[in-house]
């Protein structure tokens, strides 16, 4: 019987493979000659440790196998690597635009691994075309960025192994950062900001009640004083609304006291206009503020009040 699928254009076949699990896409290489290397032209890979184990028939994922899967895909644009334990991995791609790293464990003697000068452990990112980097449950002290990235958006979620962390790789061209800040890792806020000296926009979601003494004891990040323009702060709803609001305004105070030019947005879930006005009054008691616009409202209903400040720091209110 004639193989009608194999007669389809390469572009259409690549689209079909893109919508298959990566493990299934790679298996098509055993089909007739035309399929042998076709999977390498698929612009997306989703690598999960358990699937890799089945595919390569190894007890543990091989560093070499992972690196080969990535480097032998010449048009790869989207890559997600999940639930992987390796000694060393280098993500090298000239075409990669989006990289997601979830639940990494770097194995080594006594499970105490850091990326040294010999480059034998940890993760190295060499992706000059990268535009988006997402890090979740990942030991940040174990990776470095080799190539110069021209423009990138970064999302950090639930990262662990902070106790040994002193600084992140520097992202000189990072302009927008979306970050989750948990009570137990309050000291990470200035570390996030210090790693991005030219940051212009921050989307910050608070989980729990940040410890301001840990934040305030760190040096003021350069980006707050030179480049920050927009800050959005959202507090995950908690039972103790008064304590939640206090935490949110304290974080806002830290940013406002150190920023030179700022537009601030606070999302207050399930609050009334009177509550928004009360929060504004607290903000106005902050010293040395230099913001030009404040938006306060409820995200769910898209209710927002805007406050615009003039040079004399008088403000006018309007609905947005």
From Swiss-Prot:
Domain FBD: 212-268
Protein name listed in UniProt: Putative FBD-associated F-box protein At3g60710
Residue ranges annotated for the F-box domain, each copy included: 2-48
Signal peptide segment: none
A Pfam family annotated for this UniProt entry: F-box
Species in which this protein is naturally found: Arabidopsis thaliana (Mouse-ear cress)
């Amino acid at each position: 019987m004639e193989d009608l699928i194999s007669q389809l254009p390469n572009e259409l076949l690549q689209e079909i493979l893109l919508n298959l699990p990566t493990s299934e896409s790679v298996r098509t290489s055993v089909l007739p000659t035309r399929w042998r290397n076709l999977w390498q032209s698929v612009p997306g890979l989703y690598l999960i440790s358990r699937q890799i184990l089945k595919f390569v028939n190894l007890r543990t994922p091989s560093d070499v196998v992972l690196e080969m899967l990535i480097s032998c895909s010449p048009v790869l644009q989207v890559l997600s690597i999940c639930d992987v334990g390796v000694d060393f991995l280098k993500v090298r791609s000239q075409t990669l635009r989006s990289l997601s790293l979830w639940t990494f464990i770097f194995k080594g003697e006594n499970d105490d691994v850091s990326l040294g000068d010999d480059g034998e452990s940890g993760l190295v990112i060499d992706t000059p075309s990268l535009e988006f980097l997402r890090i979740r449950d990942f030991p940040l002290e174990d990776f470095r960025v080799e190539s110069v990235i021209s423009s990138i958006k970064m999302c950090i979620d639930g990262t662990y192994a902070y106790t040994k962390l002193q600084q992140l790789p520097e992202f000189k061209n990072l302009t927008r950062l979306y970050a989750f800040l948990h009570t137990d890792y309050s000291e990470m806020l200035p570390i996030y900001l210090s790693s991005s000296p030219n940051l212009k926009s921050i989307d910050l979601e608070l989980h729990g009640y940040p410890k301001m003494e840990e934040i305030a004891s760190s040096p003021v990040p350069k980006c707050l004083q030179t480049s920050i323009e927009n800050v959005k702060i959202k507090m995950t709803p908690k039972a103790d609304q008064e304590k939640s609001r206090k935490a949110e305004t304290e974080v806002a105070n830290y940013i406002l006291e150190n920023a030179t030019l700022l537009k601030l947005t606070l999302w207050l879930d399930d609050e009334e206009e009177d509550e928004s006005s009360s929060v504004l009054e607290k903000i106005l008691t902050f010293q040395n503020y230099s913001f030009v616009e404040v938006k306060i409202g409820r995200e769910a209903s898209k209710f927002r009040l805007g406050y615009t400040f003039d040079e004399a720091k008088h403000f006018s209110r309007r609905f947005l």
